[in-house]
Amino acid sequence: MSSLFQTYGRWDIDIKKAKGTYVEDQNGKTYLDFIQGIAVSNLGHCHEAVTEAVKKQLDSVWHVSNLFQNSLQEQAAQKLAAHSAGDLVFFCNSGAEANEGAIKLARKATGKTKIITFLQSFHGRTYAGMAATGQDKIKTGFGPMLGGFHYLPYNDPSAFKALGEEGDIAAVMLETVQGEGGVNPASAEFLSAVQSFCKEKQALLIIDEIQTGIGRTGKGFAYEHFGLSPDIITVAKGLGNGFPVGAVIGKKQLGEAFTPGSHGTTFGGNMLAMAAVNATLQIVFQPDFLQEAADKGAFLKEQLEAELKSPFVKQIRGKGLMLGIECDGPVADIIAELQTLGLLVLPAGPNVIRLLPPLTVTKDEIAEAVSKLKQAIAHHSAVNQ
C-alpha cells in the first residue's frame, strides 16, 4: 500500500534513467519522451551544461536565505529582463507560486481588486491559482474560492463588451496558448482586443508563460509572436530545465509595490536553482537556438499534417514545439498504445494528444515519433470501426 496521497493517476512506468529525448524505465525499456516533465526539460533530460553548473554549485553553497546578497540571482534576473518586456524579477519555486505573486503584485500596484481571466484557462492549484483558473473541475470541494475573479470566453474579441463600464479592474491574466485547456492558441485579433482593453481600463496585462515560455513556442516567450506588451510575465517549468524554480517578471514601475516584507519566499532563488537557471538561459536565449526550435516545431507540424490523415484526427494546432492533436473521441487508449510502442505523450483534455518534445529534439526523433503516432491512431481507428 502506498504512503502517498493519491493525487495523481500514475502510469505503471518508473523512470530510472533519462538523457536527452529518451528515458528508460524499471524494466530497461526505452521510450522517446515527448512529455519532458510537462514542458520542463526544454533542453532535454540531464543536459550537460545544466548538470555541470548544478554539480559545481553543490560543492559551494546551496542555500543561505534571501537576507543575503545573491549574485547568481542578479545574473539570472538580468538575463530574463534583457530578453523580456520586464525589468524586475522575483524568484520563487514553481509556476503556481509565480502566478500567486503576479496576482498579489497586480492588486498591490493598482490598488484595484478584479482580475479578468478566461474559460478553460489553467493558472495553478493554490487558492489564487484555482480562483484564476477557468475550469470548475479543479475547484470542486475546495470552496469558497478567493473572490474578485471574472471569467470570459477565450478567443472571443467581443467578450469584453459584457463587462460594460465595470471598473476596479486590476489586471487581465491569460495564456497565449492554453496548455491544459487543450493546446488552444489565441488569435491575433483576440490578443489585440485584450491589449486594447487593458489600455482602456488602465489594467495590467499578466501573461502566464509557465508552459509556453523559455523557448517552447520558438520564441523566448510566446507573447512575442503577437507583439504584446505585458506588464507582468510568469515563468517556471523550462526555466531550470528540471530544477524547481519559477519567476515573476514585471515592469520597473511596479517596483514600489513589492518592498521588503510585502512578499517573500524561503527557498525561492536559492543558489542551486540559480545555477540551473543561468546555465539554461545562456543556451535558450541564443538567437540561433530559438530559430532552430521554431524550425523543428514547423517540421513536426508539417510531418503530423502529412502523415495523420485519419478521419479520427480533427485538427493539429499549437505553436513551436507545443502541439496538440485534437481527435474525434477520447485519446486515453491511444496514449496507452503509444507507451507500448515506446513513445510518451500526454493528454490535454479528453480528446487532445499533447506533444512537448525537448527543444533539442532531432528530425530523426520527430520522424520516429510521428511514425508511432500514425501506427497507434491507425490501430485505434481499425479497432473502433
Curated annotation (Swiss-Prot):
Listed cofactors = pyridoxal 5'-phosphate
* Pfam short name (any one): Aminotran_3
Alphabetically ordered keywords of this record: Amino-acid biosynthesis, Aminotransferase, Arginine biosynthesis, Cytoplasm, Pyridoxal phosphate, Transferase
Q: What is stated as this protein's family in its record?
A: Belongs to the class-III pyridoxal-phosphate-dependent aminotransferase family. ArgD subfamily.
GO terms for biological process? L-arginine biosynthetic process
- What NCBIfam families does this protein map onto? argD, PRK01278.1, PRK02936.1
Its name, as the record gives it, is Acetylornithine aminotransferase
Task: Report residues binding N(2)-acetyl-L-ornithine.
Answer: 125, 265
Q: Which residues form a coiled coil?
A: none
Q: How is its cofactor bound, per UniProt?
A: Binds 1 pyridoxal phosphate per subunit.
Entry's Gene3D superfamilies? Aspartate Aminotransferase, domain 1, Type I PLP-dependent aspartate aminotransferase-like (Major domain)
Q: What is its EC number?
A: 2.6.1.11
Specify the superkingdom: Bacteria
